[in-house]
């Protein structure tokens, strides 16, 4: 088996992206600085623009370069959290500590009211869609251990978004690699009861399934179910010099879905595509190098 390698590029996002060849990246998992939350003390940084519109425009510019380096059948997983409009002071990050002496402030952006939720993730998602990206999914990252908030007039924020974006309508996505455990006992008892009295739910379910072999023909109970769009993943502490680290358990399913565990073909660059048996619709573990949806990129060790 070929040894996995990786390369770390440090610097301005656009400048570093420009060093990569066209259509050379298989999958992108990214979480850019959120709008109006923190000053990292870097000139020209993303996140401290005067208005949400300027912030969105900056990200659209970055993602145009992402689109250039992404393979035509590649995927992007974009994590973004929201912000609230307020007169505030930003904390300036200084390695592991926050230098509160260098704080500076910002006012409520034009067009918004104090305490408005700004809807930044969706502003970015729609702008990228308008710029030519396919917006395929809005994954909810549910945090069972969210940061405490002192508010008493709204619920505590306990989720962020992970948008799945693509360059085309067809792309590489390994659904088998990220299947989740199926809980089907309730469905089985409700729709496949052996008792004499069949409920209306039984009949409706059978009618809905039609010629697809009933609900059993639509579901693969033995091998799990297609991953849902709400991912419950706890935040994790990090001792390094960073204040907003994505949990590895959030990154892992993105990489597994967007890349092939067997790598890619050395001749054509296509990934090894998983082949499913038609009889059971279950993955066999076999792979095909001539996949119509193919991607290439760097494999992260341990994922």
Q: Predicted regions: what is each one?
A:
Residues 2-303:
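Core catalytic lobe of class I
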């Amino acid at each position: 088996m070929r040894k996995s390698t990786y390369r770390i590029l440090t610097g301005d996002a656009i400048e570093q992206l420009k060093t990569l060849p066209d259509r050379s990246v298989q999958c992108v998992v990214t979480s850019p600085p959120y709008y109006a939350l923190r000053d990292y003390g870097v000139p020209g940084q993303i996140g401290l623009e005067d208005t949400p519109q300027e912030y969105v425009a900056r990200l659209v510019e970055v993602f145009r370069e992402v689109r250039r380096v992404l393979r035509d059948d590649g995927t992007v997983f974009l994590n973004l959290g929201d912000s609230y409009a307020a007169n505030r002071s930003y904390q300036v990050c200084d390695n592991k500590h926050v230098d509160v002496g260098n704080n500076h402030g910002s006012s409520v952006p034009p067009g918004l009211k104090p305490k408005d939720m700004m809807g930044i993730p969706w502003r970015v998602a729609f702008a990228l869609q308008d710029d030519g990206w396919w917006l395929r999914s809005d994954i909810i990252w549910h945090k069972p251990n969210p940061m405490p908030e002192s508010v008493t007039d709204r619920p505590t924020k306990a989720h962020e978004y992970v948008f799945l974006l693509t360059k085309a309508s067809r792309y590489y996505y390994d659904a088998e690699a990220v299947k989740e455990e199926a809980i089907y006992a309730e469905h089985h008892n409700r729709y496949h009861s052996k008792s004499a009295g069949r409920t209306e739910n039984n009949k409706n379910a059978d009618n809905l399934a039609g010629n697809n072999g009933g609900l059993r023909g639509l579901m693969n109970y033995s091998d799990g179910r297609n991953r849902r769009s709400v991912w419950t993943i706890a935040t994790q502490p990090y001792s390094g010099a960073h204040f907003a680290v994505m949990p590895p358990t959030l990154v892992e399913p993105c990489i597994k879905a967007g890349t092939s565990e067997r790598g890619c073909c050395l001749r054509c660059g296509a990934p090894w595509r998983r082949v499913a048996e038609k009889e059971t619709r279950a993955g066999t573990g076999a792979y095909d190098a001539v996949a119509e949806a193919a991607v290439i990129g760097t494999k992260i060790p341990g994922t």
